[in-house]
Amino acid sequence: MDAIKKKMLAMKMEKENAIDRAEQMEQKVRDVEETKNKLEEEFNNLQKKFSNLQNDFDTANEGLTEAQTKLEASEKHVAELESDTAGLNRRIQLLEEDLERSEERLQSATEKLEEASKAADESERGRKVLESRSLADDERLDGLEAQLKEAKYIAEDAERKYDEAARKLAITEVDLERAEARLEAAEAKIIELEEELKVVGNNMKSLEISEQEASQREDSYEETIRDLTQRLKDAENRATEAERTVSKLQKEVDRLEDELLAEKERYKSISDELDSTFAELAGY
């Protein structure tokens, strides 16, 4: 009877130990599953962060491309403005040269007119002197008449030259007025172009600053990408290690579940044996 009681006590203690071990196994399984879930969640978060950073880098690249396009357009516009300015300067130079030539021709015509007028006056004075000295001297009179005719011809030619010079002078004055008007318009256009060039210059400075900032951001993004790439590699390595750990833990879980099942079967066997023993005792 004492032996049976000792056996029952031993079986009861073994049953309690089996229950404790089973509970410990179940807790260990829960801990392993929780660790596995945390690792999977961390891996998913790393994948999301890398995707977001990749999107930010694409956006930065698009902004850099747009800034480069604007800079090229501004440089093209500046080149066109410089070409237009050079053309206007050339036209102004040609107008100034034409004006100088017109002034030289006018000066020459004025000098010739003065010479013709002096010659006509001198001839007229000579004719009067000759007429007063000798009205009977036909030869001298004929000579004087010839000189007078020549003087008149010279005077008429001078008048024609004067009229031609006056006409050319009037045309030159009109051309000069037109040239001055074109010159004023050209100067106004040059001022306007200079203002536009200043604006374009300021825009180019802004674009250069934006380009430098974009370059700095690009360098920063490249550094960030390199860092993220390294972090991704580290995360992949950690994920790979985590997968290996999870695999090991899964194997451990399977082993613990097998042990738990064995303990449950053993517990059931002990319970059945206790029930049988109690039944035998009840029969006594």
Curated annotation (Swiss-Prot):
Organism superkingdom: Eukaryota
A Pfam family annotated for this UniProt entry: Tropomyosin
InterPro entries: Tropomyosin
Keywords, alphabetical: Coiled coil, Repeat
Residue numbers spanned by region Disordered: 103-131
Coiled-coil ranges (or none): 1-284
Span of the signal peptide: none
Function: Tropomyosin, in association with the troponin complex, plays a central role in the calcium dependent regulation of muscle contraction.
Record-stated family: Belongs to the tropomyosin family.
Record note on domains: The molecule is in a coiled coil structure that is formed by 2 polypeptide chains. The sequence exhibits a prominent seven-residues periodicity.
Listed PANTHER family: TROPOMYOSIN
Subunit details: Homodimer.
Descriptive protein name: Tropomyosin-2
Species name: Biomphalaria glabrata
Organism phylogeny: Eukaryota, Metazoa, Spiralia, Lophotrochozoa, Mollusca
